[in-house]
Amino acid sequence: NLVQFTYLIQCANSGKRASYHYADYGCYCGAGGSGTPVDELDRCCKIHDNCYGEAEKMGCYPKLTMYNYYCGTQSPTCDDKTGCQRYVCACDLEAAKCFARSPYNNKNYNIDTSKRCK
């Protein structure tokens, strides 16, 4: 679910950047999404949005689905073996890892999406 996603983000980036920094970034990080992603980090969010869309097609509720994960010393892992929990955790895990390896550009935080996301 979205709360667990914030914890996975923190785990994947070793607490270097608070998860709220990703809530209003670029064209796809946060609610909604349109246009062309502004950078690599924004592409991570678009992929995550698409993954949630696929989960919904499977009958899952990704924003609400609780799952089991482990925040290890190397990187987080998903513990569920089947179903929506496994799929949604995988969506969140891949996005969190993508965030951790992608540069963060302060200029792409809280942008005017009506102008830059066409």
UniProtKB/Swiss-Prot annotation:
Subcellular location: Secreted
Cofactor section: Ca(2+)
Enzymatic reactions: a 1,2-diacyl-sn-glycero-3-phosphocholine + H2O = a 1-acyl-sn-glycero-3-phosphocholine + a fatty acid + H(+)
Transmembrane regions listed in the UniProt entry: none
Keyword field: Calcium, Disulfide bond, Hydrolase, Lipid degradation, Lipid metabolism, Metal-binding, Secreted
Keyword Calcium: yes
GO biological process: arachidonate secretion; lipid catabolic process; phospholipid metabolic process
Active site: H48, D92
Cofactor note: Binds 1 Ca(2+) ion.
Domain of life: Eukaryota
Tissue expression remark: Expressed by the venom gland.
Molecular function as annotated in GO: calcium ion binding; calcium-dependent phospholipase A2 activity; phospholipid binding
Main localisation: secreted
Cysteines joined through disulfide linkages: C11-C71, C27-C117, C29-C45, C44-C98, C51-C91, C60-C84, C78-C89
One Pfam family this sequence matches: Phospholip_A2_1
Enzyme class, first EC level, given as a word: hydrolase
Record's function text: PLA2 catalyzes the calcium-dependent hydrolysis of the 2-acyl groups in 3-sn-phosphoglycerides.
Assembly: Monomer.
Identification of the protein by name: Basic phospholipase A2 3
Species for this entry: Laticauda semifasciata (Black-banded sea krait)
